[in-house]
A protein has these predicted regions:
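Active-site-proximal, substrate-binding regions of enzyme catalytic domains
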Residues: 2-95, 102-106, 111-113
Length: 116
């Protein structure tokens, strides 16, 4: 099964469209990072938590040394810590990235990561 890492942009857009459940109907194992989850506001987090509890959404929590590597990652200024955490995880587990964020998409492409 393919693995994809999502950013907050995907969750926010799908929640606004009331399509979040469809993300978990595709044949892809979905991961995100704790940093991305912490970026969501309460209402968004409540909707995403259902998929965390049902183990359809996997949350990766970085070690302190991994967080240090993420902070030191050379990346465009437009990328947040959360964005860089998505790239770091995708590289480490050889996964694709799901994002609608243009700066993140461009950076992923430069890193030879599959991005949709």
């Amino acid at each position: 099964m393919k693995i994809a890492i999502t950013d907050a942009n995907i969750f926010i857009d799908l929640i606004k469209l009331q399509w979040l459940g469809y993300l978990f109907c595709i044949d892809i194992e979905i991961y995100t990072t704790l940093e991305v989850i912490n970026e969501l506001i309460d209402d968004q987090l409540e909707r995403v938590t259902i998929f965390i509890q049902s183990r359809q959404l996997n949350i990766y929590s970085f070690s302190s040394s991994e967080l240090e590597q993420i902070m030191q990652m050379a990346a465009p200024a437009a990328l947040t810590m959360q964005d860089k955490s998505v790239v770091f995880l995708a590289k480490n587990i050889q996964a694709g990235v799901l994002s609608g964020d243009n700066p993140l998409r461009k950076f992923c492409a430069k890193q030879n990561l599959e991005v949709k």
